[in-house]
């Protein structure tokens, strides 16, 4: 896919939890708990005008679902702020300093005065119905590892409550995560390839982590990706769980937009100007159906309704992403708006147990070339689903609708809700503006002293190649590497890094687990000259639980020969094969038991 020709633009929003002693707007500890919660309470959310006098479209979308929200909390780590029964406290100062420090890293301009804003979020993940956020800096630009990274904004915001599950129309949330400080870094739109965007996302995330002020572990970093192509629309893809998935998400979203534009072009050629809402009850057609799917609905007292989709023949089944068709997009909308599980459409019938005779009977009844079948018990749900389907069919005439979508594990995406509008954010009335003082900026400078390129320079100064240094920084082993270097001072850092990244990786491909304990034992044996570098792989491969590297070397006959013995061996072999061939011959005969440096030294001391 030629992304430049497509006019691909990608923006990133990187959210990283900060490792603070308190939450952002209260003094509760920022810890996640798995023990039984002490209490539960229930809330419902209702539509009201924002302080700007408007209603956000995403709010309408969520509230129409008529959900109940149940919140779980703990008396010793949850307070009235999280329950929206007490005004917020002033923002955590350490979080502010970190955000200002990260802003300095990216040469972003801090605001002189910070204003806490309310961003409407009505999926229940915020008890109040809004998320508090503070814009800290804007207009940053930095060149890091060859990438020109433009930063639109840097913000602090409170993390949402943890979703624990659903019980019918009730959504269960836990309040332990609500209020944990997040730093959000939003980039300018980029024209890089999907793989390069992944690199940029890693650079941004690592730049925050290297400060030592970010939480580590699963769920502490989340990426949102904004994708558009020429003629398409900005689509926000929420919650890409892993950096390695970013290229696929971008590729598949670009592909989806290309295919939606193809559908729009084809509809134009067919002369389809609009789709009117027109439904036909076809329940009686399926009175003797063999389809388990349909039969289950009918036995529950439900109905089957056909929604007319004139002009969409062969387009409902048109693939827009791998394994996902335009009909799948319609089903996503129906699932998001209603309690129905999905739909069937004419391009996939006969199928799902529905016979050719039943299909012909439906076609005769609806009188158009294509249609969508909806099945359900509640009449109101069927009416709502029919309206949603027709709205999406009409949106297809215009090409690509602006949406917020969720990332699937395979990189494809699904519809979540419409893109929010400007009425989503308004000022927090319970907190005063915060002055960005000279003292705060001075403390922020300390945060900004560390950098990704500075860390790579530090590693290369230890003797690591730039490639190995970059791989080490990208790996989860940097901290342990630094511990090993400090502990085993006589070992070259290059050797430690190579064993951790290359040898351990090769063994992992064989199914051999190389723990930190095993590595420490091997490094100790190397430092004490018990084994050679050449023996490391064999020793790690053979090491049993509780066994030391020295014990394994003895068992395998790979204990390093002392220099005096190496000298005698070298002298004998040199006489036998000649001085020039002696090094290779000794290493071949005594593989894993002699060190190459010892052999070279012995050769240099020969007097013939």
UniProtKB/Swiss-Prot annotation:
Among the record's GO biological process terms, what is one? translation
Q: Which PROSITE patterns does this chain map to?
A: GATB
Q: Where are the residues of the annotated region Disordered?
A: 402-422
Its EC number(s): 6.3.5.-
Give the matching SUPFAM superfamilies: GAD domain-like (SSF55261), GatB/YqeY motif (SSF89095), Glutamine synthetase/guanido kinase (SSF55931)
The broad enzyme category this protein falls into is ligase
| Pfam families, per the entry | GAD, GatB_N, GatB_Yqey
Organism domain of life: Archaea
Its recorded reaction(s) are: L-glutamyl-tRNA(Gln) + L-glutamine + ATP + H2O = L-glutaminyl-tRNA(Gln) + L-glutamate + ADP + phosphate + H(+)
Instruction: List cellular component terms (GO).
Output: cytoplasm
Q: Name one GO molecular function term.
A: ATP binding
**Bridged cysteine pairs (disulfide):** none
The protein's matches in HAMAP family, at most eight in alphabetical order, are given as: GatE
What is this protein for, i.e. what is its function? Allows the formation of correctly charged Gln-tRNA(Gln) through the transamidation of misacylated Glu-tRNA(Gln) in organisms which lack glutaminyl-tRNA synthetase. The reaction takes place in the presence of glutamine and ATP through an activated gamma-phospho-Glu-tRNA(Gln). The GatDE system is specific for glutamate and does not act on aspartate.
Name the protein family.
Answer: Belongs to the GatB/GatE family. GatE subfamily.
Summarize the subunit comment: Heterodimer of GatD and GatE.
Name the record gives this protein:
Glutamyl-tRNA(Gln) amidotransferase subunit E
Q: Origin organism of this chain?
A: Pyrobaculum calidifontis (strain DSM 21063 / JCM 11548 / VA1)
Q: Which gene encodes it?
A: gatE
